[in-house]
């Protein structure tokens, strides 16, 4: 059935290309949007219908598992105070951005996602849930350097994809990272954004970028001392011990203590069995 569905879609797509050459472009765009409506999915969360754009099986899976893949992240977001500022660094398609915006009143969210594969879906999810007043998408990478054009390596060019690397030659485990999918893009440091008053200091920060969490923290050494920051959730690979030590040293220096360490063992097996979400609380 899936082969039949794909074949039909390809035939329709070819028909659209031919029609586009001989017809009005606006008609084609409207028809294309009509076809894509089948990719919109609603899920009952927080006793509300929340909408998601799910153009493939991976994004559909991410939406299906939003509440049970990382329950510690959901619990952490539930603890946020109203009228707070949340930085979602490594937002992917925006699951936790959308959840936080729906859960908390008057929250302001800066959603960081440099992957061109994910930005299309992230922006749609914000738009279809009418969260433009609460959510601000930052479409570039963060690192320890200011204003650099560096290579972003994508594990796969697909919506909902992860395990990417910005400006480094290693992956989430510290091993050499070889991929064919890459392009140069802009990145800067957190301190640069704060010092230039481009963004506001957050109360809560989530960092899940699959490999350069330590570099992002190095680029935030001034901001991390700010008492406005209440807690930081960082995805850490315990098996990437050099990186883990750097992260703990930075957090301790800025008066953070480990509040919790959790993961759902069902989803983190084999290559991912060293990965945990650490929540650091300001002392």
Where are these regions (language model features)?
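S-adenosyl-L-methionine
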Residues: 1-130, 134, 175-179, 258-283
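Active-site glycine-centered loops adjacent to acidic/histidine catalytic or metal-binding residues
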Residues: 90, 141, 208
């Amino acid at each position: 059935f899936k082969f039949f569905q794909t074949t039909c879609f390809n035939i329709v797509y070819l028909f659209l290309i031919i029609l586009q050459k001989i017809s009005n472009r606006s008609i084609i765009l409207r028809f294309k949007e009509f076809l894509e409506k089948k990719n919109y999915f609603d899920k009952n969360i927080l006793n509300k219908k929340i909408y998601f754009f799910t153009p493939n099986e991976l994004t559909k899976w991410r939406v299906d598992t939003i509440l049970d893949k990382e329950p510690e992240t959901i619990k952490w977001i539930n603890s946020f105070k109203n009228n707070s500022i949340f930085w979602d660094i490594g937002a992917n398609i925006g699951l936790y951005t959308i959840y936080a915006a729906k859960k908390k009143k008057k929250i302001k969210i800066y959603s960081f996602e440099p992957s061109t594969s994910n930005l299309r879906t992230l922006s749609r999810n914000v738009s279809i849930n009418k969260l433009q007043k609460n959510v601000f998408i930052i479409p570039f990478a963060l690192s320890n350097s200011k204003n650099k054009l560096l290579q972003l390596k994508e594990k796969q060019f697909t919506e909902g994809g992860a395990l990417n690397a910005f400006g480094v030659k290693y992956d989430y485990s510290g091993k050499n990272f070889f991929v064919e999918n890459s392009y140069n893009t802009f990145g800067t440091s957190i301190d640069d954004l704060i010092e230039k008053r481009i963004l506001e200091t957050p109360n809560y920060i989530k960092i899940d970028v699959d490999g350069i969490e330590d570099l992002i923290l190095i680029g935030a050494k001034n901001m991390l001392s700010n008492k406005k920051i209440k807690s930081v959730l960082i995805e850490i690979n315990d098996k990437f011990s050099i990186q883990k030590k750097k992260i703990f040293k930075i957090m301790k220096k800025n008066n953070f203590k480990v509040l919790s360490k959790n993961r759902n063992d069902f989803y983190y097996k084999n290559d991912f069995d060293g990965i945990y979400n650490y929540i650091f609380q300001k002392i």
